[in-house]
Amino acid sequence: MNQTTETDSMRINLQRTYKDAINALNSLQSNFASIEATKKLGPSVNRNELSINEVHEFTKRLGYTPTDFNKLNIIHITGTKGKGSTCAFTESILKQYTISKIGLYTSPHLKSVRERIRINGQPINQEKFAKYFFEVWDKFTTTKSDPQECPTLQPCDQVKPMYFKYLTILSFHVFLQEGVDTAIYEVGVGGTYDSTNIIDKPTVTGISALGIDHTFMLGNNIASITENKTGIFKKGVPAFVSRQLEYPETHELIEKRAKQLGVSSLEFVDTEDLPNVKLGLSGEFQKQNAALAIRIANSHLKTIGITQDLPEFNNNDGKIKKLSNKFIKGLENVDWPGRCQIINNNPTGITWYIDGAHTIESINASSTWFKQEQIKLEKPKRRALLFNQQGRENYAELLEKLFNVTYGTGSEPQIKFDDVIFTTNTTWSSGQFNSELISKNTSEDAVKKLEVQNNLSEVWRKLDGGVSKRHVFADIETAVNYLKDLGDKDLQVFVCGSLHLVGGFLVVLDNERD
């Protein structure tokens, strides 16, 4: 199993500072070699079942049972595209009501790992993160698992959960200790075997748009992915699912799984125009996520006994008849950096369009959003693309999708780039990462040789016939400085691809060095 043991060289002199917590957490990351080995094995029910059982065991060693988590009144959301935005919309709506503490657990983070564990919209502070992190760390060091029941967790005092699993367990501990009374959980990968799926009785479950991703864990077809995602359905709990416009064939399987798992109700949610609402997240596709969040929040509020100031729905088709002012305010005030985010960077005059996207479906949505924003502009502008997809085997296919959407076909408007830049996710020109942006799951050799970036540059040359100026940089800081040095007051820059790129870009833009 993917666990980590503390060898003598890895033993960390734990001084109980936030920086020490980050260093300890980073020691739990899977390295590139172990991830590649897992990919070659393909999906494994036995391995996945073992993984989720280990989460149960680790929480047991902390002194918790699955029913303890029911106190959190958990909303559980999965999907391939839009699950994070749906969580953000849901949180923003609920903040308008008299809920004392709302927890939000999401992944990945952009700039700081504390973004993953929020209370009332704010990441927990460094002091609390370190405090709770080491409470969990010490408990795992001083407790034991039955070697017959948990042979993979031996020796108990050395084995810790890997990075994401540890953070998930930590989030449960934080929320319970902090007295959170509503918690929103975004699934990491899939559903059935995800670390978050130890939840016994959520108040409601939701699934956003489905697509092909994480195939080495979930299978390489939409049916197996749907089977896994629907694993968050729970007996007696309502389920809301975005209507799957790209994969309508999944509806029958979703209905079958809902029946198998005994949900109290299942509703497919259509995208709706909300004429009196200006969503806080731009992009036409966010209407779908907002519509799903409206149903999830409405259901949750009723479950916890809040029945005033809720939306009204039509009896015949279930569509929204009237939104309450609180729902409107929540939808308009949502804040979710790095997703369809626009930053006007004075005094340089550069406008940055930022969106993390790593699947064909999300690249399509992201590129469409950027294109629509550019079409609105009155006169032609100079444009640049900043792109990376490290660790994605289909990076060329993703770049080709971006090109096809922005450049268009036939009579479609064409949005072309004057400069195209490919960079690694390395933060600084010194070759260093900010400590909270370190990722061990890519090949160091490939990063040093700029293999992916040079390949992407060649792919683009073939796509546009060598018209754009192409640049390959070893780090994000150098790429950003190049764009700033262009001196074009109307430069429009599309920052797209890996969320690791987006997070590093935001750190560089704000010059937030460790």
From Swiss-Prot:
What does the record note about the cofactor?
Answer: A monovalent cation.
GO molecular function ontology, one term from the record = ATP binding
Tell me which EC number(s) this protein carries: 6.3.2.17
- In what pathway does it function? Cofactor biosynthesis; tetrahydrofolylpolyglutamate biosynthesis
Cofactor(s) needed, names only, are: a monovalent cation
Instruction: Indicate where this protein is primarily found.
Output: mitochondrion
Residues bound to Mg(2+) 1 are: S107, E186
* Binding sites annotated in the UniProt record for ATP: G82, K83, G84, S85, R339, D355
Q: Which UniProt keywords apply?
A: ATP-binding, Cytoplasm, Ligase, Magnesium, Membrane, Metal-binding, Mitochondrion, Mitochondrion inner membrane, Nucleotide-binding, One-carbon metabolism
Catalysed reaction, written as an equation: (6S)-5,6,7,8-tetrahydrofolyl-(gamma-L-Glu)(n) + L-glutamate + ATP = (6S)-5,6,7,8-tetrahydrofolyl-(gamma-L-Glu)(n+1) + ADP + phosphate + H(+)
Localization (cell): Mitochondrion inner membrane; Mitochondrion matrix; Cytoplasm
A single Gene Ontology biological process assigned to it is: one-carbon metabolic process
Under InterPro entries, the record lists: Folylpolyglutamate_synth, Folylpolyglutamate_synth_CS, Folylpolyglutamate_synth_euk, Mur-like_cat_sf, Mur_ligase_C_dom_sf
The record's listing under PANTHER family reads:
FOLYLPOLYGLUTAMATE SYNTHASE, MITOCHONDRIAL (PTHR11136:SF5), FOLYLPOLYGLUTAMATE SYNTHASE-RELATED (PTHR11136)
Family per UniProt?
A: Belongs to the folylpolyglutamate synthase family.
Name this protein carries in UniProt: Folylpolyglutamate synthase
The scientific name of the source species is: Candida albicans
What is the gene called?
Answer: MET7
